[in-house]
């Protein structure tokens, strides 16, 4: 049985650059047609990481920005995904379980199909709830391990 290979466009550090290189949503929607026209991506990373915080710095409403940015991809049949920091999913410090659970429902409502979860500590106690919450919200859950080198990890 042959396996289908799907390519994903990932902006690894773009959303984490404290606004230095992150385009506004009006700029993002202008490049969406070119990405779609390439015809090689089944999935596009549209938010997560620092994306929403940067929207706020620009004075944009993150809810509106994510919806606008994901819309052209959905119309073209392309799934969208986001970076998720597991326990630190909403900020750089731990977030309570009830807030994390709501987070996935909101992201799905905004138009995000897939959550790509990682935990800097590779701690399954932080990753497992993310998988559950994503599935409960109707999202696809992908997880990754981090390459960590230290005497402790």
Feature locations, PLM:
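Generic hydrophobic/packing signal
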Residues: 9-10, 20, 36, 40-43, ...
């Amino acid at each position: 049985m042959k396996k289908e290979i799907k390519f994903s466009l990932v902006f690894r550090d773009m959303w984490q650059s404290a606004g230095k290189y992150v385009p506004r949503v009006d700029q993002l929607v202008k490049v969406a047609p070119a990405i779609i026209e390439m015809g090689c991506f089944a999935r596009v990373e549209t938010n997560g990481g620092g994306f929403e915080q940067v929207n706020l710095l620009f004075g944009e409403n993150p809810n509106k920005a994510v919806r606008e940015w994901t819309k052209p991809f959905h119309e073209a049949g392309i799934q969208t995904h986001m970076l998720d920091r597991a326990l630190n999913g909403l900020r750089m410090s731990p977030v309570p379980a009830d807030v994390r659970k709501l987070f996935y429902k909101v992201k799905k409502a905004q138009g995000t199909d897939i959550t790509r979860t990682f935990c800097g500590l590779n701690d399954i106690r932080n990753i497992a709830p993310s998988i559950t919450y994503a599935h409960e919200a109707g999202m696809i859950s992908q997880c990754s391990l981090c390459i960590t080198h230290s005497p402790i990890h």
